[in-house]
Swiss-Prot record:
Designated name of the protein: Probable 2-isopropylmalate synthase
Pyruvate carboxyltransferase domain mapped to chain residues: 20-271
EC id: 2.3.3.13
Keywords: Amino-acid biosynthesis, Branched-chain amino acid biosynthesis, Leucine biosynthesis, Metal-binding, Transferase
Cofactor: a divalent metal cation
Database matches in InterPro entries: 2-IPM_HCS-like, 2-isopropylmalate_synth_dimer, AIPM/Hcit_synth_CS, Aldolase_TIM, LEU1_arch, LeuA/HCS_post-cat, LeuA_allosteric_dom_sf, PYR_CT
SMART domains, sorted: LeuA_dimer (SM00917)
Gene (UniProt): leuA
Recorded catalytic activity of this chain's protein: 3-methyl-2-oxobutanoate + acetyl-CoA + H2O = (2S)-2-isopropylmalate + CoA + H(+)
Molecular-function annotations in GO: 2-isopropylmalate synthase activity; metal ion binding
GO terms, biological process: coenzyme B biosynthetic process; L-leucine biosynthetic process
Lineage: Archaea, Methanobacteriati, Methanobacteriota, Stenosarchaea group, Methanomicrobia
Pfam family, one: HMGL-like
Amino acid sequence: MYTLKEGIDFYIEPMQNKKVTVFDTTLRDGEQTPGVSLTSSQKLEISRQLDKLGVDIIEAGFPISSEGDKESVKSISNAGLETTVCGLARVLKKDIDACFESDVGLVHTFVPTSDVQRIYTIKKSQEEVIQLAVEAVQYIKDHGLKCMFSAMDATRTDPAYLIEVFKAVQEAGCDIINVPDTVGVMVPSAMYRQIKDIAAEITIPIDVHCHNDFGLAVANSLMAVEAGASQVQVTINGIGERAGNADLAQTVMSLASIYGIKTNIRTEYLVETSKMIENYTGIRLPPNTPVVGQNAFSHESGIHSQGVLEKSDTFEPGIMTPEMVGHRRRIVLGKHTGKHAVKQSLESAGVKTSENQLDEIVLRIKEIANKGKQITDADLYAVASAVLGKASSEEELIKLKEVSVMTGNILTPTAVVKADIEGKEIIAAKTGVGPVDAALKAVRDILGESNHFRLQEFRIDAITGGADALADVYIGLENEKGRIVTARSANPDIVMASVEALINAMNLLYKKEKS
């Protein structure tokens, strides 16, 4: 057994003397995710965020693919980043020239080496492939740039031939070789053996690029590092072709927290970076996504919640904390919730209860949850207010007075909202793509300088059937400090339900910030 933190032992031997370089391909392979298309300005902003995160190499794109991609790579290359900017190129001079014209510091050139890809895509013999690879490497080195060579589909390539290819490019002056699991067919034990075999024959650094077709990309990357690889290719949120690539956050935190391996990643920016990619790609992470997902440090079970509140190491990894990755710990209320979790949630909003009152609140919360209802912060405070005999409006920032909307097939949807903000009546009118959008924009306008939040989730459900169904609107809000609240409202009028839910959530944020 090995110890990385006092009181917590592992079967994995630490590799604390090793350092791994992080190669991020979010802007190249990540953008090949079906349905994803990033603008040049978004790519530049993402590259600055990756630089802030501490990524060693950014693969900024495939310059030959379009004039726009070439200009985007060039703008990133000249953005004054600390990281090395890389461009992708086939083993063709025109591709490599496009990388030169993009001012990159590293050219990543590749050619298929497996029989299935070599025969059916480029129609070249094994000897011709080696010649193309060597000429490409020499051409790059003759121009004074660093070169990484990829044997595409390496994990389905004849092992002896693969070693022959790598030896040839090494002799030609290649700086680093990449072993890509292009179609994600490796298992960790096989990846370990393959990298071990390559490392025994090759003296230059080894990089791995693992795809996630069977959900093994991160595990394969870790096994490659155990076997001798010193660089991993990853993407933010694991985006990429088909099922994606090895996820940066999961790979880096496993290396750092479990193996004790050093990287240059500033892990406190992991969640921040993940959210940027979510917003720009439109691909939302499942709540249970490791490291950066909403539920990564969330607890509902009474036993788990009580243990975490006493000592977080009891039901969390211990060697990875929410603070390390820029996250927050959450205690979620539901039918499994215990007294400790309810008490902590109430106290975070400044609500004090007696033991008897707390017992009654817990009982009511469980009754609601057992009916299949998701418990929001608003539900908890409404129940607590009823039990404590307090008016729920005592600490409201906003009190809704009136909502009116106009919409139709030829009218621009318009909403007028009247509300009291700390006793001052304010009216706002806004247009939108629909009446709900217009009404929510009007509420934001009323808030003015208090409007420092992100609408994290917006969901509408019909509680009853028929045309007169009750609309149940669920809203999740996150403020600039990363604090998340949830609220809901039910109303036969979908616009009213939406506005009420947003105002309920804003009042909860205000209440929590005051406490």
